[in-house]
């Protein structure tokens, strides 16, 4: 769960600066930046003097690999069960209306059981998606924590 909270903080940090110089603040649509760019939440240290929002320790992770036993996917909108109702986070090709993430165990029942979702609202939800969790998580297009998802208390410390 700490990883999804770190994602939330990194997105807030990312959107505090106009990263692409277009005059609009926006959220990152990917975790790893394109090499030589700052278009994701993590980029390798460079001579720009800017530290990536996910910090240097995240650099040990590899795109499409697990991090602390979990895999992650950024969602580009939310469904009717989300606070505020259904809408896209995108305006044109910019993700400026919000953000969300789904995290699921890389190896179900080995690295974890629960899957987690978080949005720009900062609420974390959890659910046991079962052994087919990866397939279900990859099929998700929107942050939509229906009644089958449980809100996690902010002071609950689990991974």
Q: Which residues does each PLM region occupy?
A:
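Low-complexity, Gly/Ser/Thr/Pro-rich intrinsically disordered linker/tail segments
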Residues: 69, 79, 139-159
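A short, surface-exposed interaction/processing loop segment used at functional sites
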Residues: 114-149
């Amino acid at each position: 769960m700490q990883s999804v909270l770190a994602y939330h903080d990194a997105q807030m940090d990312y959107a505090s600066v106009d990263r692409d110089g277009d005059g609009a603040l926006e959220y990152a649509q990917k975790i790893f930046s394109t090499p030589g760019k700052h278009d994701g939440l993590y980029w390798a240290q460079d001579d720009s003097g800017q530290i990536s929002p996910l910090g240097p320790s995240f650099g040990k992770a590899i795109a499409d690999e697990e991090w602390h036993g979990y895999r992650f996917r950024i969602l580009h909108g939310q469904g009717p069960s989300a606070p505020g109702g259904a809408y896209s986070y995108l305006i044109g090709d910019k993700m400026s209306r919000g953000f969300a993430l789904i995290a699921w165990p890389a190896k179900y029942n080995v690295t974890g059981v629960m899957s987690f979702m978080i949005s720009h609202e900062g609420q974390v939800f959890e659910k046991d998606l079962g052994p087919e969790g990866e397939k279900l998580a990859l099929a998700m297009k929107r942050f939509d924590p229906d009644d089958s998802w449980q809100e996690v208390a902010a002071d609950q410390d689990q991974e």
